[in-house]
């Protein structure tokens, strides 16, 4: 989506970056050791902040930080991070005596955090914060790494060479959880296996807020560069699996353990496509209409009626839904948990507030990006002006002004870099908003499971009442015939059998509904706790970076102001 814009920006800034690099080398500034190719990552900021429900993580060059700075120990020995630090020994000694600046305390340990925590990239820690379980804060751990994508050929014969290829990813799991029966596992999986895992979890854990899986974007796979698309999918899959293992219930599921441990082909039952489900439902429908199928199976009622497997059940639940909304009679059972209904409304309101905050975060990132780019362009413009002044200089005063202009250009370029670093950190911290927007979809799915289970209970109760009324009428009619009506007696026996099956299904459906209610409440309480912690960390990190980089930028311009103070004395 942003490919053409990225190419354009990289072309526009390539010459500027070379000039910037050369200019700073002349000045001997320690920042020449840092990465100056930040514009490529800048082009990804807009995409990262505007894609609200996309599970991909932006390719950001995180320059100084990989973890929450407020929990990092201060370091007083950084030479290249503070504008006050000098390469000579005397100033290094004075740095022990002076109290460190806020920027020194906040940013000096950043480069070492990833090594301490064993993080392999800058994106892993922010993605792990979402759906954090209490056990993740203890000594127990489970770490997922997705790497080494490979193209493989389908086993089936194809007339088109290379026409049936797919990408597999190596998924490595390291854990000390005893339930997994080992400490390290490595398997290869394709995207279809991810879809199967997500479907099995959705069936087995109704009422839970299961993190949404990445979408299979056919369009982007055709438009984007193949290597870029594969890398984005790899990051998205890693982020998804890390969220699953962070869930306190899903992490112990048999489905996830099989997915992470079973070698070879995934032994989970594959997902049935919509066409096959519709065909199965069409085959069963005539038998159900003629009464050969009996009542609803107690095994099937624990799954939602939608999907096409059981047309008759779909029609019955649709009729019940219409009757609930437009009928004059009250349903046999209704949602009476007022506290839950209030919480449900608050969750919907929360989603709207997060959407609004996300839009403002996008605007902030764009403004910071524009500020950094403009400041860099200003510095490069003064570089050219300095070169002109030096070439045309005749008097020493002209050369002095050219030197001051060079210092101004250097400061503008440094400030531009700090804005880029700040923007990178802003994206990392405020990306929590977009993660929670995706999680709101899972919350809605959990609430939909509850509504679907309630509708199934209502439908079965209505059906049971109708069957009992029919059986009672047949018994009354049969009692009026001397000796009994054999055909009616047979129908009564069939109805009683259907009533028994429906009664069992109703009991199973009620138990399923009660279980989903418990799951909903436990998930809502868990999300409330984790949201408070995640949002607090987000705000702490965001504010700390704003303050730290503001001080860095202020120090840059303070140095320029001190060096040019002589002009004030001359004018006075």
Curated annotation (Swiss-Prot):
A 1,2-diacyl-sn-glycero-3-phospho-(1D-myo-inositol-3-phosphate) binds at residues 190, 216, 233. The modification Phosphoserine is found at residue 133. Ubiquitously expressed. This is Sorting nexin 2B. Residues 1-97, 114-136 are annotated as: Disordered. Belongs to the sorting nexin family. Disruption phenotype: Reduced rosette size and inflorescence length as well as root gravitropism defects in snx2a and snx2b double mutant. Gene3D superfamilies: Arfaptin homology (AH) domain/BAR domain, Phox-like domain. SMART domains: PX (SM00312). The keyword DNA-binding does not apply.
């Amino acid at each position: 989506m942003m490919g053409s814009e990225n190419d354009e920006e990289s072309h526009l800034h390539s010459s500027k970056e070379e000039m910037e690099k050369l200019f700073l080398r002349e000045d001997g500034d320690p920042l020449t050791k840092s990465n100056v190719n930040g514009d490529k990552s800048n082009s990804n900021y807009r995409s990262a902040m505007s894609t609200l429900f996309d599970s991909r993580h932006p390719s950001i060059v995180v320059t100084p930080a990989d973890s929450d700075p407020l929990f990092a120990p201060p370091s007083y020995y950084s030479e290249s991070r503070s504008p006050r630090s000098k390469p000579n020994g005397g100033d290094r000694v004075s740095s022990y005596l002076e109290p460190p600046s806020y920027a020194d305390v906040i940013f000096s340990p950043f480069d070492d955090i990833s090594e301490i925590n064993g993080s392999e990239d800058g994106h892993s820690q922010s993605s792990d914060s979402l759906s954090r379980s209490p056990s993740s804060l203890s000594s127990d751990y489970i770490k997922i790494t997705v790497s080494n994508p490979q193209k493989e050929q389908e086993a089936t014969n194809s007339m088109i060479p290379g026409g049936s290829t797919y990408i597999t990813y190596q998924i490595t799991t390291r854990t000390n959880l005893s339930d997994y029966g080992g400490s390290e596992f490595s398997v290869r999986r394709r995207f279809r296996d991810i879809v199967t895992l997500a479907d099995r979890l959705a069936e087995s854990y109704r009422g839970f807020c299961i993190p949404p899986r990445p979408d299979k974007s056919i369009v982007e796979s055709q438009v984007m560069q193949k290597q870029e698309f594969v890398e984005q999918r790899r990051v998205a899959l890693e982020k998804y699996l890390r969220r699953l293992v962070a869930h306190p219930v899903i992490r112990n599921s048999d489905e996830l353990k099989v997915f992470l441990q079973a070698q070879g082909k995934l032994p989970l039952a594959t997902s049935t496509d919509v066409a096959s489900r519709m065909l199965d439902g069409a085959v069963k429908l005539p038998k159900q209409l003629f009464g050969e199928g009996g009542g609803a199976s107690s095994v099937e009622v624990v799954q939602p009626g939608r999907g096409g497997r059981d047309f008759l059940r779909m029609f019955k639940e649709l009729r019940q839904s219409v009757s609930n909304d437009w009928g004059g009679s009250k349903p046999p059972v209704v949602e009476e948990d007022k506290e839950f209904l209030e919480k449900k409304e608050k969750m919907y309101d929360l989603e709207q507030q997060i959407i609004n905050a996300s839009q403002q975060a996008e605007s902030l990132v764009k403004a910071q990006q524009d500020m950094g780019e403009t400041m860099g362009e200003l510095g490069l413009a003064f570089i050219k002006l300095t070169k002109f002044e030096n070439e045309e200089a005749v008097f020493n005063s002209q050369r002095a002004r050219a030197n001051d202009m060079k210092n101004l250009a250097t400061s503008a370029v440094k400030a531009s870099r700090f804005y880029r670093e700040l923007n990178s950190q802003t994206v990392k911290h405020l990306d929590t908003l977009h993660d929670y927007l995706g999680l709101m979809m899972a919350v809605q799915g959990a609430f939909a499971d509850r509504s679907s289970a309630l509708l199934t209970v209502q439908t079965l109760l209505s059906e049971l009442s109708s069957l009992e009324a029919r059986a009672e009428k047949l018994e009354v009619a049969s009692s009026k015939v001397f000796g009994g009506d054999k055909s009616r007696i047979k129908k009564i026996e069939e109805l009683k059998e259907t009533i028994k099956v429906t009664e069992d299904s109703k009991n199973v459906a009620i138990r399923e509904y009660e279980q989903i209610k418990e799951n909903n409440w436990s998930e809502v309480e868990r999300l409330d706790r984790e949201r408070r912690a995640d949002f607090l960390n987000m705000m702490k990190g965001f504010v700390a970076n704003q303050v730290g980089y503001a001080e860095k930028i202020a120090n840059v311009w303070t140095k320029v102001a001190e060096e040019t103070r002589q002009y004030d004395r001359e004018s006075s």
